[in-house]
Amino acid sequence: MTILLQQKTEILQFMKERNFIYRFLAKSLFLPPTQEIFKFYIENRHLVLSILPETDNGLKFLEQGLLDMAQYRAEKWQALEKEHERLFFNSGPVPVYPWESVYTGEHILYDAHTLAVKSEYRKWQLDIEDPTQGPLDHIGLECSFMAVLTERAMKDLAEDKEDGFVENIKAQQHFLQAHIAGFAGLFCEKLRKAAACDFYRGLGFFLEFWIKSDLQNLTELLALLLKDKSREIKFPLRKQVLPESFLAADTFYIGLKHSAETGKQMKIVPTAGRNNCGGCCVVKAHVQDGNILKVTTDSEPDAPESPQVRACVRAYGYRRTFLSPDRLKYPMKRVGERGEGKFVRISWDEALDLLALETKRIKKCYGAASRYVNYAWGYSGAVQAMRLAKRLLALDGGYLDFYNSYSSACTSYATPYTYGTKFTGNTPDDYVHSKLIILWGHNPAETIFGTNTTYYLKKAKESGTKIIVVDPRYSMTAAALADEWIPVRPTTDNALMDAMAYTIFTENLHDQKFLDTFCLGFDASHMPVGIDGKESYCAYLLGEKDGIAKTPAWAAKITGVPEIKIQQLARDYALMKPAALIQGYGPQRHAYGEQPVRGGTVLAAMTGNVGIAGGCASGAGATDRHGVLSVPTGENPFPGRIPCYLWTEAVAAGEKMSATEHGLEGVTNLDSGIKMLWNMSGQCLLNQHGDINKTMEILKDTTKCEFIVCSDIFMTPSAKFADLLLPGTTVFEEDNMRSPWGSGDYICSMSQVIEPPFACRPEYEWMKDVAERLGIREAFTEGHESMADWCAALYHKMQQAHPELPAYEKFRQRGIFKWAHTEPQIAFAAQIADFAKNPFPTPSGKIEIFSPRLYALNKPEEIPAVPKYIRAWEGPEDALREKYPLQMIGWHYARRCHSVHDNNEAMEEAFRQEMWMNPQDAAARNIVNGDRAEVFNDRGKMQIFVKVTPRIMPGVISVPQGAWFSPDGKGIDQRGSINVLTSLKATPLAKGNAQHTNLVDVKKIQCEEGGA
């Protein structure tokens, strides 16, 4: 092949033109606009515009934009730079995603499409210059890549390297066709709609035209070069000669650098599920050259003594969640009203200087106890952000701490009043020994509650165990495993338990010997000295004080469970021994949620199902067989603690909090309310807290809490209330390790898979820098400079107690260590085997059915000494039902772990956010399946799709908790965020969240109201 001189000159002009345009596009799309960058293009705008056909309707926008730039002053350039950042580089969702993979792949970053682009760069020894700018399939970088190729093509042409020139043109055509042309149209359409200035609007027209035109011209050029006689060549003649200054003034790579690094082979990196679901599943990331192509799960041999630790739907969705283009990307500080969501991007140095300054200022002005680390479990691990923040503040003089949790406040707090400990559960491998399992408000098929919980329930069912589910909702667990479903009205669980106990006692089905030997306060003859026998549990059942016997007929009216069903349930539980009554966390997240917790323990004691294989002591049900050590928080110099659910009270009126009314511990009063709040990777700042509207009102008052710092990976509803917002990392971008909740027989390594994108940093990394500014870095790190260092140190400490653990590197390589147990762990087996040597860890040494400690509180109406049914506020017997006739509960949806994954589009396709409503209630409101409805009470309004189904009992609606609060202009939530309607009122003893106790009404949304 020989290129004629005339052709060569013409082609060279063509290459110059293309090089100029691609550099113009690369700069316009990738670099923040400055006068220095655009001066050349402003002066030569006629050459840029001459490339567009005169009929192109984007010409006037681009021309006007460049003309305007010629008149810009400093403030106008600043405004244009902000517009560029808003469009393409905002720290969070952007109007116009600039990355190819978002359009052509799974709407995520760092996938196979990103890898394909990187492979193209590698062929030409190029790589991204600054990884903090994000993935290299940015359209601006792809235009820069085309500019580099044209420059090299010109060099080949000038040196008569015709073969190299042709190969280069082929590569350009391929890259245009395979990559840029595939998404430029969609990108440009979004740019035209989103742009607020003529320049970027015109760029949206120009780019789309240019890519189509250039692809056609390259195709014609290749036909000319290859002398394709089968087609008519229409390679365009160049009508003007471009000056040499086009190249001389502009010869650097834009966003790219030379790199001799070659492509990398795919590898599988072991990590694990880090959701706070109680599970800890094996996740294997298949990664190549910094791009995660897929995830798989445990593939080791499956055995009964060591089953596989398989991932659920949430873990399989990690890529779609954590590689989202909506990630927070850079540190930001608030510039609008708190909660408005308006931020400006700042550097890490500025962010950490500000944080250190506020930490010092607030301590000096209000004392160390005015600083608070909010309850936050956006992820679990040995190195966990909330605990790290506590460690940092403990070393800096202290902080106001909390106790309890949002998950299990009542059960963790109340169970020890009966047993002296919350560790009352048998491990799940014991389920197979049960003849009957009652899952009371327990739905592990969706909540997970330990990765293999449903595996062991399935094994029990296969061995003949009868499974009964007690729940207002026919859950996924009930559908998959239950032999029987017993729906019960929310907040009435104790009435059902009381009637069961009444039946068991009056029909002489109870284990009197067990009660006589191990229990305190069941009947008058086993009461503490000096306490009237009418205070016993038996006296309560028989109505000796209140005149009401707790019969099945009495309970049927309250609970909605037929009398005969109550009797049969009681008989089954008493006679099908060993039986396990396993409580979930839903029933205890109600008004008086402490009562069903202790009610379940009484039933277990009455039937002698405590401390035996196949039984269950009920209550909290925690186990402590194995676990991973965590980075210690250290000793807090300030002794005060509040219940975690009452932090809003501590912000609004902390000085008025007391021990009796608010559960304040460690101190008699607080000198100040919360003035500084650290919210590290969690949504209890707003979305997961009760009464969102009231919480927003408290947070918006900057005279109360003066500074809020949040670390997160998305612009969540909670993150919008930050004064300083820091971009965190995901499971793929850091080292950690963890175990499931205490029932787990394994620990998992969580190895870093890819580098953190953009300017994202693990909390530990930036907290070290804050510690440096506070003068406590050495004490904070203890010589551990990374999360990996901490994991290694903690693992080596674990090896001292567990010498069977393999070498640390082997553990990291395999990703998991499993203990193989031949026998289950049975809570209180030692007490039952030898009570004299092993009393229960209560003050009396017995199971305290009657609690002297609760009796001493002298609050029998709300905190009785024996568990009993108490009419709940906003319960079925509340007069408020005249106004709001429906009870509303929440549940943990299979698609989310609390609020994590709500922004996962694939999950939304599989599990739409919708409330469940019984056909009777729907018909009364003219609602049919699929309608949108408004749910409302005095606290707020939300709109949501309706699933009409008999799987929820009449009089009750159920809303999946965790949806992200998304208000419209009137403040009406459009996403179905349940906490718009829940209350800040806490339970009387534990001061726990009663977020499942709500009265509401529902109305169908008519078309004119904006419904779908």
Q: Where in this protein do the model-derived segments appear?
A:
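Glycine/threonine-rich phosphate-binding loop and adjacent beta-strand/alpha-helix elements that clamp
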Residues: 428, 732-756, 766-767, 771
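Active-site phosphate/pyrophosphate-binding segments
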Residues: 525, 529-655
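Surface/interface-facing alpha-helical segments and adjacent flexible terminal/loop regions used
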Residues: 1-245
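Long, well-ordered, tryptophan-enriched scaffold segments
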Residues: 464, 468, 473-576
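Long, contiguous, secondary-structure-rich segments that constitute the structural scaffold
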Residues: 763-814, 899-901, 905-915, 920-1012
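Extended redox/cofactor-interaction regions of prokaryotic respiratory oxidoreductases
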Residues: 389-457, 463-465, 469-470, 495, ...
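N-terminal export/assembly segments and adjacent metallocofactor-ligating motifs
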Residues: 241-509, 680, 969-1012
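Phosphate/diphosphate-binding loops
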Residues: 272, 471, 697, 703-707, ...
